[in-house]
């Protein structure tokens, strides 16, 4: 197992859940946390602990984004009209790395970040190398022609474990994806339950 996979699956073990729905996740075989004390019985979490866990799980799902970036998304979510929890999810799903992953251009959220950093993605015909770039409705995301035969892309095309959500119009032949609308929480194909309202409570306390 590579160091990247070890770090990724450490999040799974800490949460005690297979948060990306991957077949090779270690929690498919055991349900305790990482480290020598991982097998100790865990007591009931306090309200604070439950909220913190919800935040860690959602942050981890989006390739363990930094606290600074995550808090900035929370602040923006609370300033928008409507439900702040729904807004939080909608903003996270507008990240370029999330869309590259959802479109199945790459096999993992971590790979999406690396793929974008290395300049393999264009938005509306222009190269964008910022994973947190905020995609707008109607934007077209594509894999650069020179990058379409990379192993990561070919691997992702063969994955049967996740479907492309309805808020993306994807052409796998051309390796393009159009962002058609901002999704609600119920439309996002999380393999495990996410609780954005607990995250809003965590930061609001």
Swiss-Prot record:
CDD domains recorded: S4 (cd00165)
CC per GO annotation: small ribosomal subunit
Alphabetized Gene3D superfamilies for the sequence: Ribosomal Protein S4 Delta 41, Chain A, domain 1, RNA-binding S4 domain
Domain of life: Bacteria
One GO process term, biological-process aspect: translation
Family: Belongs to the universal ribosomal protein uS4 family.
Subunit structure: Part of the 30S ribosomal subunit. Contacts protein S5. The interaction surface between S4 and S5 is involved in control of translational fidelity.
This protein's name: Small ribosomal subunit protein uS4
Name of encoding gene: rpsD
